[in-house]
């Protein structure tokens, strides 16, 4: 008989927040898309994880489960109230996953941006009571359990952002793997409105390499270690073209198409997840001001006009 507490690695006195964090961690571990070579077992485990979350996150279901086990949930036996005699119906594991992550890639930049806005607006939060035009916010890995495995430090993950009249304008994070400071990932993203157009800039610094790109509807520039990179620019344009050509909003298929790509960094031992709807790189942050940066941007823009993305 399955033990839902054991499935999520929880004690029986676990709080609702503990249950949600545990689901985040275990669901990502057993997601079928992350286990293509062991998909049958992964699907079974993924289903158990979803069921465990549905039961333990619901006070009524959890109370019945604690008293009578899965038999009580299935409507069997004679030890539970008549009002529950018909049992419960579980949702599809994928539906539970989407509901928890709000149909967003759990490792995407937008996921963290939205989560931080939720933090600011949370009832009783000291952040939510501050002036939104000038407020700064900080958080640690305890707020986002998906980063816990990256760090052996109590404050291994830290984010900082600022809120202006346009809303959330920047977000940055830093994560270390357990092998030490030599292998790390730093990601930064920013959005700003310029002449009515949204400019999205993203940057990733992984160990000793920095990649940066700017997008205002079309790829504007692509830099590697602050130097224009034609190969990277071409690959990014190619990826976007292929993604656009392969996308059809009216097409349907009975086959399962993965929404998420689980990427392993062999050198750093770090697992990362990207959305198949987003570019396969983590591009970007903007360095404020500087004649050198402006000069490079102009040079890359001239080159980009010669290409058709």
Swiss-Prot record:
GO terms for cellular component: cytoplasm; nucleus. Residues 282-309 are annotated as: Disordered. CDD domains: DnaJ. GO terms for biological process: chaperone-mediated protein folding. Residues 290-309 have a biased composition (Basic residues). InterPro entries: DnaJ_domain, DnaJ_domain_CS, DNJB2/6-like, J_dom_sf. Residues 3-69 form the J domain. Pfam families: DnaJ (PF00226). Keywords: Chaperone. Probably acts as a co-chaperone. This is DnaJ homolog subfamily B member 7. It comes from Homo sapiens (Human).
């Amino acid at each position: 008989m399955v033990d839902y507490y054991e499935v999520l690695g929880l004690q029986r006195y676990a709080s609702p927040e503990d249950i949600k964090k545990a689901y985040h961690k275990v669901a990502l571990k057993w997601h079928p898309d992350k286990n293509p070579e062991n998909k049958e077992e992964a699907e079974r485990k993924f289903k158990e994880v979803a069921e465990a979350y549905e039961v333990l996150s619901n006070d009524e279901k959890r109370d019945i489960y604690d008293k009578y086990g899965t038999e009580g949930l299935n409507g069997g036996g004679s030890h539970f109230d008549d009002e529950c005699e018909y049992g419960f119906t579980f949702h599809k594991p994928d539906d539970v996953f989407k509901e928890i992550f709000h149909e967003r890639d759990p490792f995407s930049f937008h996921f963290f941006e939205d989560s931080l806005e939720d933090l600011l607006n949370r009832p009783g939060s000291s952040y939510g009571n501050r002036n939104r035009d000038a407020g700064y916010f900080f958080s640690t890995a305890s707020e986002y359990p998906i980063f816990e495995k990256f760090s052996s430090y109590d404050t291994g993950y830290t984010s900082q952002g600022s809120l202006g009249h346009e809303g959330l304008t920047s977000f940055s994070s830093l994560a270390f793997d357990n092998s030490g400071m030599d292998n790390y990932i730093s990601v930064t993203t920013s959005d700003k409105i310029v002449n009515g157009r949204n400019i999205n800039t993203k940057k990733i610094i992984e160990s000793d390499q920095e990649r940066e790109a700017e997008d205002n509807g079309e790829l504007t520039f692509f830099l590697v270690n602050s130097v224009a990179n034609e190969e990277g620019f071409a690959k990014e344009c190619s990826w976007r073209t292929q993604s656009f050509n392969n996308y059809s909003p009216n097409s349907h298929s009975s086959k399962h198409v993965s929404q998420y790509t689980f990427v392993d960094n062999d050198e750093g031992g770090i697992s990362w997840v990207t959305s198949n709807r987003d570019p396969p790189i983590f591009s970007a942050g903007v360095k404020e001001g500087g004649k050198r940066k402006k000069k490079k941007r102009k040079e890359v823009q001239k080159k980009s006009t010669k290409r058709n993305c």
